[in-house]
Curated annotation (Swiss-Prot):
Binds 2 magnesium ions per tetramer. It catalyses: tRNA(Phe) + L-phenylalanine + ATP = L-phenylalanyl-tRNA(Phe) + AMP + diphosphate + H(+). The lineage of its organism: Eukaryota, Rhodophyta, Florideophyceae, Rhodymeniophycidae, Gracilariales. Its EC number is 6.1.1.20. This is Phenylalanine--tRNA ligase beta subunit, chloroplastic. It is an enzyme of class 6 (ligase). Mg(2+) binds at D346, D352, E355, E356. It is found in: Plastid, Chloroplast. It holds the Pfam family B5. The keyword Magnesium applies. Tetramer of two alpha and two beta subunits. Residues 609-697 form the FDX-ACB domain. One of its GO terms (biological process) is phenylalanyl-tRNA aminoacylation. Its cofactor is Mg(2+).
């Protein structure tokens, strides 16, 4: 819809408002401004405004002026543009129309069909409409200004005698438009003369001509739903039906009709007759109740001044600018809002009112962050902490040289056919048959794709959701419950990881090198862990589904300091060890929960002992099932508080004795307040003798 800036300035106060500011504000408020052109001869700007389907009230000059008045908090220049005028009308003999909401008729006699005044000619020319005469120009002017339909008929062609308003009536009739026998349209008649089928066409035989000196002015508002239904039945759309569907607000009808009669009577030097009309009752005024807290929580804090919410006074003022009728209940801290008639099509829910408040106040004046509910503050705070931890994990892995991968959560098949996989019934595609239970499987597929492209070395990680069934749930025949988890997984393969010297050939990544990278990642993340050897992944609650993917001789379970399983690290089952591939996978939630940030407040400061220490190196031959941790715990079980440290300095295995291995331990003894005496040394030697005898072959 095109608009004239000069015309708008005569309706709403736009002094000291630049046109560029007007365009920006309208665009931010949801009304896109396009096709701006300047008419230098008349010092005017013509621009096109597009709006949404639920804001038909904007598609006329008064409607846009009313919206600009709310946006800029400027007054409309005449009360006529705010409120409907009160006209003394007589009732027409029309009852229960299905097509009409309003109908007004007035007879005008002794009319002179003069040329339109220059100001009217200019306004029409702004819309590329050629001015002809008053009878043609004024209905077009009224439609552009108010969005209301006005029709003018030659009174003498309707009746040669004075108009009797009781003869106006509505009748349902078929065969009116293009021979439609099964479709009845409501037709406005005067006695036996058909004036027009409501909303579709006009009787050409009663139109005005050059000899017209007595006219019938008719204004009407159609039921848009009726017009839409008839258009669908007829499969036909006419120029008049389109205008009726795009008609402006019903509340502006009387103002538009009064102005059209006034202009025709004034410039045509005519005598006006009495006003007759038919008006359906308006729907009950819509009332919405909105809590003040709801408005503040949804909109959030404002940028201007201190970071506070909109006050009750500010909200009240904004609602009044929108021509709403607000009432604030201080006891309930809520607003009771009466919605004006011309906004009842698009203001239906409380959220619509809140959006209007934000639009008028300015979306850019609010802080761009999620609203905080006092009940959920703690959860939102925890979510932010979790997100920050995930960001740090990504950062640390990138620093170690790993690239992030993204895969979707489906398999086209599961290579190991494990019972704990979740199968999709009736999948949309073949490659969406299973939900993934591990990130590592997709990373191995990524590696295979890279190998086919000639990329031997790949170091990637992925963070995503996995879906699996607990192995314990398989014992039941009832419906199995699926579970969703957030995991972190990585894959490392590097054939040129290091070389001892420049003259040596490159060496591939070893198990210990890969383990060192994982340890460095955990150290930087500040997660204390314990590495545990595992012989069968059925013992694992988290990673039992990787049993066929990893080499059990090169696989370790990673636990936190409470010995809870949080991750796994191992070597893939490759046929060749030339370029070994290693993977790790963590339960991300448990990994983050295991982070123990270093805090100097929690540190215990002790001075170094100035007394000499005693060192004992021992060599033990133990069974393969006996771990180093168990041996250390056995030494500490002697409850000797002089033990300062226990370190492994050697490890070897005799191939002739497969069931045992040898380990060298260095135990350091020291007292913090004295020098060790003979009694201390004798106790230490006795404990070592007992230990050697215990692990003696």
């Amino acid at each position: 819809m095109k608009f004239s800036l000069r015309w708008l300035q005569q309706i709403v106060d736009l002094n000291n408002i630049k046109f560029s500011t007007l365009v920006d504000k309208l665009s931010v408020s949801g009304f896109e401004v396009e096709d701006i052109s300047r008419n230098s001869s008349n010092d005017d700007m013509i621009f096109d405004v597009t709006t949404t389907a639920n804001r038909q009230d904007i598609l006329c000059t008064v409607g846009l002026a009313r919206e600009i008045s709310s946006i800029f908090n400027r007054d409309l220049k005449y009360k006529l543009y705010k409120d409907s005028i009160a006209i003394s009308t007589h009732c027409l003999n029309i009852l229960n129309s299905v097509s009409l909401l309003d109908l007004s008729i007035v007879n005008v006699n002794y009319f002179y069909n003069n040329r339109s005044p220059l100001w009217l000619q200019y306004y029409l020319s702004s819309y590329n409409i050629k001015s002809l005469n008053l009878l043609t120009d004024i209905p077009q002017y009224i439609y552009l200004k108010w969005g209301q339909s006005i029709e003018i008929f030659d009174k003498n062609k309707i009746s040669s005698v004075p108009i009797q308003y009781s003869l106006f009536n509505l009748q349902k009739k078929s065969h009116i438009i293009y021979d439609s026998p099964n479709i009845e349209l409501e037709v406005l008649r005067y006695d036996d003369v058909i004036l027009f089928p409501i909303g579709f066409s006009l009787n050409e035989n009663i139109k005005c001509d050059a000899a017209t000196n007595s006219i019938v002015i008719m204004g009407y508002v159609c039921d848009k739903q009726y017009i839409t239904d008839i258009k669908k039945k007829l499969k036909l759309s006419t120029y008049l039906s389109q205008r009726c569907c795009n008609q402006g607000s019903r509340s502006d009808f009387l103002n538009a009709f009064y102005e059209s009669v006034y202009l025709l009577g004034s410039f045509g030097f005519a005598t006006l007759g009495k006003f007759y009309g038919y008006h359906k009752l308006y729907n009950i005024s819509r009332i919405l109740f909105i809590d003040k807290v709801k408005i503040q929580n949804i909109l959030g804090s404002v940028k201007i001044g201190s970071y506070n919410y909109l006050t009750v006074k500010e909200i009240f003022t904004l609602l009044e600018r929108l021509n709403f009728l607000p009432i604030y209940d201080s006891l309930k801290s809520s607003f009771k809002i009466h919605i004006p008639v011309y906004r009842q099509d698009d203001i239906v829910r409380p959220i619509d009112v809140i959006e209007e408040v934000a639009r008028i106040y300015g979306f850019d004046n609010f802080i761009s962050k999620l609203p905080l509910n006092p009940i959920d503050n703690k959860n939102i705070f925890l979510n932010n902490i979790f997100a920050n931890k995930v960001y740090r994990i990504r950062y640390l892995l990138r620093c170690l040289g790993l690239h992030e991968a993204q895969n979707y959560s489906f398999y086209d098949y599961y290579p190991f056919n494990h019972d704990t996989q979740i199968k999709i019934y009736n999948p949309l595609a073949q490659d969406q048959s299973f939900l993934r239970s591990s990130l590592a499987v997709h990373l191995t597929l990524n590696q295979q794709d890279n190998l086919r492209q000639g990329n031997k070395d790949i170091e990637v990680f992925e963070i995503g959701k996995v879906f699996r069934l607990y192995s314990s749930s398989l014992e039941y025949d009832n419906t199995l419950n699926s579970f969703e988890f957030l995991h972190l997984s990585g894959l490392i393969a590097n054939s040129i990881f290091l070389r001892p010297s420049w003259s040596d050939k490159e060496q591939s990544l070893s198990w210990f090198h890969a383990k060192g990278m994982v340890e460095e990642f955990l150290d930087r993340l500040e997660v204390p862990v314990v590495w545990k050897k595992i012989s069968d992944l059925d013992q694992s609650n988290l990673f039992f589904n990787l049993m066929h993917l990893l080499n059990m001789n090169w696989t370790a379970i990673i636990c936190n300091r409470f010995h809870e399983e949080i991750g796994i690290f191992g070597k893939l089952c490759n046929k060749s060890d030339f370029n070994s591939t290693y993977v790790f996978e963590f339960d991300l939630v448990k990994l983050i929960a295991s982070i123990e940030s270093l805090n100097h407040i929690n540190s215990i400061i002790n001075p170094y002992s100035s007394y000499p220490s005693l060192t004992r190196d021992i060599s033990l031959t133990v069974k393969n099932s006996c771990t180093i941790s168990f041996i250390k715990a056995r030494i500490l079980s002697y409850e000797n508080n002089l033990i300062e440290s226990i370190e492994v300095f050697n490890y070897y295995k005799d191939k002739s004795i497969n069931a045992f291995y040898n380990v060298g331990l260095r135990i350091v003894y020291r007292a913090h307040n004295r020098t060790l005496n003979y009694s201390d040394i004798n106790r230490i030697d006795q404990e070592i003798d007992d230990l050697l005898n215990e692990y003696k072959l």
